[in-house]
Amino acid sequence: MRFLLLVLAVALLSGEEGTDSTVWSQYARGGLSHDQGKSGGHGYYRINRKTVTSFRDLRLFGYGLGDDSYIYLRYKSSTKYSENVKLYNFTTASYQKNTRADLAMRYHFNQGFGYFINEYNNGHVTGELGHAYDMSDFLNDTRKTSYLKGGIFWDHELGKISTKLETEWFKQISDVVTTDLSRVQFFAEISYQLNNLLSLIMGFEQDYYTANKQSPQSYYFSLGWQK
């Protein structure tokens, strides 16, 4: 885990040299979570680096629900082919541990191409298509699975209010495991800016597994900080 953090930190700092257009941002959150009948607390930290053509983003999220805990670490890198081109490539690597789901660990990797479907003054809509790979350990039962991956992402700002809507689709294409882990993931978030640093945030997440029709979902309410 420490080695993975080091690799992701180096990746975040690497790349093209800083220019006048380079923008660094940091975010932190703390609040309440509710997942399948259990309530608890959560914490979140995010740092990203943007230029005209590139985006590097590192996120760390964790929560506790009674005796259960969840940890999620994700790094995403995306690069436009040029400033005026809407097409970009992306790479995502993540680590998860979820004691409630008996998930000892999951390493996830995906890469592919994205396209800015619509860019406007207050936000943008992007679409992505690529290949994804999971390596999971459920109570010492190791599973290696690959998927086709697609997604639609919408970010919008209106005054002090900002919203995010995301839908990602994973279609299992490997037969290494007998269980079909194909799924659709939904995410929605709305935030209200209290001042230059603080905001109130509400969000909803749901996974829908197409084979067994299971659809675990969670809600959260946070106080956020941004610099």
Residue map of PLM features:
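Outer-membrane beta-barrel "beta-signal"
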Residues: P216-K227
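Membrane-embedded beta-strands of outer-membrane beta-barrel proteins
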Residues: G43-I47, L73-S77, Q111, G150-I152, ...
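Cleavable N-terminal export/targeting peptides
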Residues: M1-T22
